[in-house]
């Protein structure tokens, strides 16, 4: 029987000033702001959150004791990034 993982939070850390927007699966905007270098935001983990960022290379995502720091290049706009763990793990393996 598969083990159900309980993930309680997701943290987005800025290593450079980065605009981010996070929507839920109803397209409701939960966060839309610039996070300043060396700051972070913590969100309760919900399935099907979507991230848009204006600086993919400027953010690091922390989830389930994993670090995803290769979403894209500095200054690169990325849309529709699923924050589901199984999607983010693909970035770790690249």
Can you say where each PLM-predicted feature lies in the sequence?
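Long, low-complexity, acidic/serine-threonine-proline-glutamine-glycine-rich intrinsically disordered tracts
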Residues: 1-24, 28, 82-94
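Generic structural motif recognizing short loop/turn segments at the entrances and edges of beta-strands
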Residues: 6-8, 31, 39, 74-79
């Amino acid at each position: 029987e598969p083990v159900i993982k309980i993930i309680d939070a997701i943290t987005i850390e800025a290593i450079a000033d980065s605009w981010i927007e996070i929507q839920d699966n109803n397209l409701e905007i939960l966060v839309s702001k610039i996070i300043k270098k060396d700051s972070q935001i913590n969100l309760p983990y919900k399935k099907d959150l979507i991230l848009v960022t204006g600086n993919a290379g400027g953010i690091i995502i922390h989830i389930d004791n994993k670090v995803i720091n290769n979403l894209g290049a500095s200054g690169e706009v990325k849309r529709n990034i699923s924050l589901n763990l199984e999607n983010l793990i693909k970035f770790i393996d690249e």
